[in-house]
Every structure is written in C-alpha cells, then in structure tokens.
Amino acid sequence: MNELIKHKLELLPDSPGCYLHKDKEGTIIYVGKAKNLKKRVRSYFRGSHDTKTELLVSEIVDFEYIVTESDTEALLLEINLIQKNMPKYNIKLKDDKSYPFLKITNESFPRLVITRYIKKNDGLYFGPYPDSYTANEVKKLLDRIFPFKKCKNPINKVCFYYHLGQCCAHTICHTDKAYWDRLIDDVKHFLNGKDDKIIEDLRSKMLAASEEMAFERAAEYRDLISGIATMRTKQRVMSKDLQDRDIFGYYVDKGWMCVQVFFVRQGKLIQRDVNLFPYYNDAEEDFLTYMGQFYQDKQHFIPKEVFIPEAIDEELVAAIVPTKIIKPKRGEKKQLVALATKNARVSLQQKFDLLEKDIKKTSGAIDNLGHLLGINKPVRIEAFDNSNIQGTSPVAAMVVFVDGKPSKKDYRKFKIKTVVGPDDYASMREVLFRRYSRVKKEGLQAPNLIIVDGGVGQVNVAKDVIEKQLGLTIPVAGLQKNDKHQTHDLLFGNPLEVVPLPRRSEEFFLLHRIQDEVHRFAVTFHRQVRRKNSFSSTLDHISGLGPKRKQLLLRHFKTITAIASATSEEIQALGIPKTVVEAIQQQITDNKNDRSSP
C-alpha cells in the first residue's frame, strides 16, 4: 500500500457510494459499490484475501469514490460506471446474449419473421428461442400450417411461396382483412401454446384426405401434427398460469459465482442462461450488479414478472428492472427459484470438476514429459524463439510455463544487440547468454527445462551457452517443425535424438501449445519493433517532431500509411502544430516518390 492510498483511506466517509480502483496507468480496473465506503474500501487493504482478490489489490495504486444518497443510487451509478469504463476485473456478460425471437409485424397485412432486435411498438414478439436453429424450425412449421403473407411484394404480385401454397397473396386469395386477422390470431394462439384446436383441424383434414384417397396430402398433415408434438416435448411446462417470467438463481463457492436464468414464456421453459465469473464484493451485491447489466442490454426482453432469491433486496431490483419483482415465499414459485439455484450450484461444481480434471491432466503431462526425458518433473519450462525478416529488426522472445500453464508475468522480450544480418544461431546464443547469465548472477529462479524453437543446430548452441559458457546444469530440448510449420519432433539427449512422443498424448499437446505461444509472442513483438522502426526512419529529422510527438503519432495512427491517409486537421487534433504537420506530410510524400522512382 502506497502513501497516497494510506492518506485517502483516512478520509473515506461512512456513506453509501461507488469506488473506482486504478492501476499505475490511471486506468480504472474495478468499480464497486458499498453501503459504507469507509468499511468496504479499507477491507481491500487489510487482512488476507483469496488469490484473485490479492491479484486485484496488487494492481491498485490509487482509487476514487463517489458518495450517493442511498444504496439504490449507488447500484444505478455502479452499473453506469461499469458500462462506461468496462473495468477488467468487473463482471463481463457474454457477448452473444441476443437470442432470436419470432415477430409478427404490425403491417397492414402482417408477416412472421425472425429477429434478434426488439423495438418498442413494432409488432408482437414471441420468445426468446435458444438458438437460430430452433427459431427457424418453429417458423418453418408455421409456414407450412398457415398460408399468411411471407413476402414484401407489391399487392398485385405473387411470390415463390404462393406457388408452394404457403403464402396467400391478399389480392388473389382474400381481399377481406378480417381473414388475415383470424389467421394471425391463430398464429398467436399457436405461439402462446394454445394449439389443441389447430391439431384438431389438422387431424380432420388428414382424415378427410385419407377418405379421398389423397394419401400424400394426408401424410403432410400427419407430419405437421408430429412436428407440433415434437415442439411440445421440447418445452417443459414449469407453471400452470401461462405467465411470462424470468427466474433467477445463483450460487457462490471458492470466490466464484454462477447465475442461472430460466426464460419461461407462456408457462413453458424455453431457454436458460448461464454465467460464471469471479466476484470481489458481497455475493448479494455482485448479483444485483449482474441483474442491472443483464437488463441494461436492450435485447433482453423484460417479462411480466421476475423471480429472485430470498436473500436479494426486492426494492433494489425494482429500481433497476421495470417490471413486477417477486421473492416467492412458498409453493411452486419458490420451487422454481430453488431449481434455478440448484442448477447454478451444479454448473459451478462442473466448472470446478473440469478445472480439477484439467489440472490432473496437465500434471500428468508434466510427469510423463519428465519421465520421457529422464529428468526431474519440469514444473517450470522456459521456451525461446527468434523473429526477423532477412535480418531486419531482429528480436527474440521467452515464454514461461509453470505447472503446465502460461505465466505471462514472467514472459520476456529481447532486442538483438550484437548480431548483424540473419543469423538465428548467433541470435539464440546472445539471448540465452543474456538471460541465464542474469539468472546466475542475480540468483533468479532457474527453469527445470529450456526449450528452443529449432533443430539440432539451435539445441547445440543452447547447450554450449548453458553448459560450457555459464556452467549451468539445466536440461535443453528442441522443438522441430515440419514443412507445414507444425510441431513435429522433440529433440533431446547426448547425442541428440528424437524422443518418441505419441501425437495424441497430453505431453505432445502441452509442447505444441508452448511452441505456438512462444512463436506468437516473438512475432507480435517483431511487428511492434518493425512498425516503430518504420516510424522512426520516416519521421526522423523533421524539425519540431521529437520523441514524444513521434510516440503520440505511433499510439494514435499505428502505421505510416494511416498517417498518410489522415487529414491535416486529424493530425493537428493531437496537439501537433500546423507547420510540423505539413513537414510530416511532405516527408511521407518524398519517401513515397523515392521508392517509386527507377
């Protein structure tokens, strides 16, 4: 805890409000709310916490707070602040939350369409459906049963569906609008689950077709009845009152929360939504934040009722969700909330089980890798790769895997300093010497295994540096790729030989992941350096354009091409004088002409 935070903690009020934690860059990394700001904010810096909270606290170098008049006002403010700042430690709802709906348009002659966007007073909406496939299947069934208008053709034209008997053009079949009203009413009844009359009508038509020996038509009616029955079985009846409602349940364990939402429409469960995330506040408060974000998404249909668990404050929910909020006390409705809560508990336990299984598999892969190489269990693995284009802007990168997982805080980047031209062996020698001479000198943690990206030559260079130059006893292996640039062989031993490694083994997947990660990290760094060098060479020697302004241009425009495409006004908006902007544009033009001249 720094002195600034210590001083600010003394000044916190005993009031409700919101607090904003910031990192060393001044970026807001977490937004929270509190009934008592003094108690809540101080709690982050006192006592012990779980690992994820300790990680959050380790990044806090400053905080701000906003006092509110009430808990409700704090909740609303928190939701808005999260929406505006998108802090990395706050709850993040999944991006693919817009579910499909069936919509009856409010045109003079309505159509049935599928949409993911709800607009007020723009028609009647039914759903949501769990996915596009389900919505399309329901629509296809309706298209076969009801020949209502399916196109936007002018009233004096027919469409393709008319010739299939699935669209009754209103100027040809019926000019009476009352016919269309009855047809749309039938569709509404069907979508609301009142399909007994429709099934009876179809059954009568099937029997009539059979008596007329029109067996193909009778089979079509039979298939339609079967389709309705199938759709019925996919929708579990959860209540007898045919009400539209969302039912919330949540469960917390080991610093994680799972929220389950049951979408019940016309008394039938048609979809559920599951979200798992780490939480840092009280469980009830983070659940409220989740609900606020959930319904702030305009694509979430707000039903007639929302059921919430017993522990949640109804008034606070009512302040953020404009519908009837119910906290069931007994009977069927309470059982529905209990069912949502039970599903949340099961989903969270499944997550933990999968994590435990993954840990066991990864641990097994590390054990097996150590056994195959005849070394101690390689708990810490450091891997290296070079990146350059014909020797220009040469760089290297190191990634670290601890217990089979990437430890990104330990990743390192290297600019090659002593090598001229494309020489991978010399570059690898320089980087390994720089890395492990420092490990030796400063007593840093050494890896259990070093992996270099390359074949026999790279491994021999690495072993020469580690064993002969530095006198260290760290095992070195090489990962060799095939002609498709895919992980192919593991080289190890003295003399070097290919280690037999089953392609479907966990240890092979681990090595493949390590090689992909170090390659990605090296290439990304090389692009950054190359782009920066391109900036420097093009923008060097321009009067009035110093390092700070060049850095500003680099951050904003990313490339010289983007600067060339920008207007003078856009560049001046960064605080760069007009005369300097003109010099920049002239320099870019001159460079372009030089390259194009013979």
Curated annotation (Swiss-Prot):
It is found in: Cytoplasm. Keywords: Cytoplasm, DNA damage, DNA excision, DNA repair, Excision nuclease, SOS response. Residues 14-91 form the GIY-YIG domain. Its main location: cytoplasm. SMART domains: GIYc. This is UvrABC system protein C. Pfam families: GIY-YIG, HHH_5, UVR, UvrC_RNaseH, UvrC_RNaseH_dom. Belongs to the UvrC family. Interacts with UvrB in an incision complex. One of its GO terms (cellular component) is cytoplasm. Coiled coil: none annotated. Residues 196-231 form the UVR domain. One of its GO terms (molecular function) is DNA binding. It comes from Streptococcus pyogenes serotype M5 (strain Manfredo). GO terms for biological process: nucleotide-excision repair; SOS response. The UvrABC repair system catalyzes the recognition and processing of DNA lesions. UvrC both incises the 5' and 3' sides of the lesion. The N-terminal half is responsible for the 3' incision and the C-terminal half is responsible for the 5' incision.
